[in-house]
Amino acid sequence: ACTTGAQNTIVGGFTGDAITTGDYNTAVGVHAVGSTTTADSNTGIGYNSLNSNTTGTNNTALGRNSLDASTTATEGTAVGMDALTANTTGEANTALGKSAMAANTTGSYNAAGGLNALQANTTAGDNTAFGVNAMLVNTTGHSNVAMGRSALDACTTGSGNVALGMDALGAHTTGADNVAVGKNALDANTTANNNVAIGTNSLGANTTATGNVAIGTNAMLTNTTGANDTAVGYLALDANTTGEDNTAVGKGALGANTTASGNTAVGKDSLVTNTTGANNVAVGWIALTTNSTGANNVGVGRSALASNSTGGDNTAVGYQALNANTTGASNTSVGYTSLTSNTTGTNNVALGHRALTAVTTSANNTGLGHDAGSIITTGANNLCLGNDSGLSGSPGGTLITDSNHIMVGDGSVTNAHIQVDWTVA
């Protein structure tokens, strides 16, 4: 019976009947705040709410059986039937919704809002779950944030995860330090760690792969076990399954890539049709856009190596450099439209504006300088050095289909100097 306690409000049978010196308590409902003796500033509204509390202070329980097992815990807030019903000594927990944090015993500093949110949590702390069934089966996983219906709802012991959106990280069980923002983001992830998925369905099929970053709707949508990939943009790397160490930035970049690894694509639709080609670099709009299995290519510039399919070991830098190349290999092209007509030619080197721009199927040509060898089509094994070399009016005349020539300079050259005598083999 109350002896010296002051400012208490008691309504209901067997309600607050153990209070002796406790002050500022409010108990409404049968057995509400029924065991409290000296504790202060508790509010229990509903049958059995805060029924077992003895000395815990500053608790608020609204709803039948809310916080009814709590004994000495403080700063708890439970709103809803069976909210925090098993809590004994867990501190500073907030549970809003029927059965929210219903199994929690000693876990502290958790916040749960929504039907069954954090329902199975027992001893874990520092979790935040808002949404129906958010973090539904979590037991000992700590420091997680889940917002959205069924977000992180399968997580049991995983820690340090952030899931924002319906079903975000929905299948996740024990993996740690993942971030999923968007509906179904990382939805199939189970035990993988250190992934970041931002956007609807991003990394949606990922199961055990780690170290991935996917930003954009459907980015890395079908990835399952491919690790250490980065995809930024709508549909970037969206078909990737097991390919690793890829970087895709831009809408559709590396969109068809499945198992290939070590590719870098920056720009809309760059490397968009690549499937198994590895170790390619594409920077620029539709750079290497039709590449499928070609490997070890570098395309930098709009439309660089845009038609390449299976050709490998090519380097193209500049607008439309090696633009028409399909299966040609081991070519180097630096400059505006240099080697732009090459399709199957190999081992060509073009450095300069429009250098070797007309070469199609020939091999082993070198053009260094503005328009160097720019009208050669099928001639092979030519060396053109200097502005307009190999064109009409240049020393030696025009090279188109001829092979095995060395052409130096244009028609304006008046002097040639060399330190030593020429030696004829």
Task: Go through each PLM region and give its residues.
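Glycine- and small/polar-enriched repetitive beta-structure motifs of secreted/surface proteins
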Residues: 1-425
